[in-house]
């Protein structure tokens, strides 16, 4: 599904789901978009089958859950291998996300959570054992997200 195929109703659905997918009913979204409940359900199904909506997940406060450390590990992998390494990196205990970067020398950003340094060190070692270079480690104090504003039909776009 190309961007030009996403209309204002799709954008409003995406915005609403980013706000609160767990509690946002198709009826709630229908009221926002001036469409029917069945239209919203069909649109959501289409967005899912087109893999624009890749899934639904909980926004976990790791600190409240007893894992106060969130580290960003900037890594360098060989360009031909970096994409193929992502599933293996995600299998490392403590890794919660991997991003493939396209500019700069560091081309993978690995996010790790843990209770203490002793949880983070084995992750860094596993990355080294895979042949990656860990170029930088950054401790994150807080992490907040917001729905993408261009999906909000009320912002004038």
Could you say what each language-model-derived stretch is?
Residues 1-157:
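A compositional/biophysical signature of low hydrophobicity enriched in polar/charged and small residues
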